[in-house]
């Protein structure tokens, strides 16, 4: 007797909380108030998000006046050397090398994904000049430049609901 009462109570609570109609087989019409609330909230979320860029490959590009290249960097070369030295001398294993100098750059197009720069010792960079040779160039790692760009340029734009959800999930 108590089991049937418990099951009936659970089913009624579930039907109320999930808003699944139990008795009616035909859908009920939506009220105009809820339609106006939905329309108002969707227009607010659209206006709050930044306008889409005309360039669909914006995530792959460097900021204005910078050029994307796949370069061997002093920083990457230094990391490789320090890693090998760190295996021999453990004190050196935590040492970090930081440098904006890069060499052996190969220019990349806007549409090329940064991940396509995957040769050993090569990393995607945003460089000051568009020089493709074995000479030296002043470059910064692509990820660092993009992160700094978005932190500086997107700080005043409110985050969209989709961005908030992605931040929570990741």
Swiss-Prot record:
Compartments, record wording: Secreted; Secreted, Cell wall
Gene disruption: observed consequences: Affects hydrophobicity only when HfbC, HfbD and HfbF are also deleted. Disruption of all 7 hydrophobins leads to altered germination kinetics, decreased survival under exposure to extreme cold stress and increased mycotoxins patulin and citrinin production.
Domain of life: Eukaryota
Endpoints of the signal sequence: 1-19
Keyword line: Cell wall, Disulfide bond, Secreted, Signal
Annotated disulfide bonds: 62-126, 70-117, 71-105, 127-139
Family per record: Belongs to the fungal hydrophobin family.
Entry function: Aerial growth, conidiation, and dispersal of filamentous fungi in the environment rely upon a capability of their secreting small amphipathic proteins called hydrophobins (HPBs) with low sequence identity. Class I can self-assemble into an outermost layer of rodlet bundles on aerial cell surfaces, conferring cellular hydrophobicity that supports fungal growth, development and dispersal; whereas Class II form highly ordered films at water-air interfaces through intermolecular interactions but contribute nothing to the rodlet structure.
Name of the protein: Class I hydrophobin E
Lineage, uppermost ranks: Eukaryota, Fungi, Dikarya, Ascomycota, Pezizomycotina
